[in-house]
Amino acid sequence: MTTRTAHRKTAIVYRMVTDAHICPFGLKAVDLLERRGFEVEDRHLASRAETDAFKAKWDVKTTPQVFLGEETAQARIGGYDATRRHFGLSVPDPGAKSYTPVLVVFGVAALLAGAVMWGLTGELFGVRGVELFVAFSMALLAMLKLRDLRSFSNMFLNYDVLARRVVRYAYVYPFAELAAAVLMVAGGIWGLVAAPVALFIGTVGAWSVFKAVYLDRRDLKCACTGGGTNVPLGFVSLSENLAMIAMGLWMIAKAI
């Protein structure tokens, strides 16, 4: 036996692959092992009956299942998350709160604003670039809210002071935010039309977030990126509303 053969790292992955379903975590497990230098024996479970029989044999509830070296109980690592832990890699907590969704929105908005400015003026930003950044951010956030308006309204009603008095406002808010954003992008007189809308929803929103977080000390999730997300209600949420207030005031100041 050569030294290379003796030190060869092998793994066996059982994963569900049928005409109706291909397990994404199985693909990720195979990819992870190959990137770690393993020769992977990729075994497909081609039917529900075959999958159920495999799970019964090994007394497991899910697939994929990863075995390192040989197919024994001692060599079984578990599923994709267990394999990541085995190699010392992090496993995301689906219930953990994170600002990532809203920061991604701000990042994409900045890239769009910079690209538009570069195409029109040869500069990356400038005053108009900042205007476009805020407007694009508002439009993207409104889009995320509108993709599931019911879920958004459920979260929004937890803290917005006006929506708790006038429930229909929770359904109007995303449309108002989107309209203000589009008008700001149009600029000129349309920016002035957008100003009172942005001022109103931004002021109500800023007070609502400030009251819930800093006065009432409530630990809530923010509806800024739509319902069903784990963005914490806090400073980043407040910044969305403060930006709308600033844009509303700026649009009025430009027209004077």
Predicted regions and their residues:
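Residue-level preference for nonpolar/small residues embedded in alpha-helices
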Residues: 25, 46-47, 148, 214
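Membrane-interfacial helix-loop segments of redox and metal-homeostasis proteins
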Residues: 101-256
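Non-catalytic, surface beta->alpha helical segment in thiol-disulfide oxidoreductase systems
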Residues: 69-96
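Residue-level "edge-of-site" marker
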Residues: 46, 68, 169
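Structural alpha/beta surface segment adjacent to cysteine/selenocysteine redox centers
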Residues: 36-39, 52-62, 71-78
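Thioredoxin-like thiol-disulfide oxidoreductase module
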Residues: 43-62, 83-93
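Local sequence-structure signature of Cys/Sec-based thiol-disulfide redox active-site neighborhoods
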Residues: 2-44
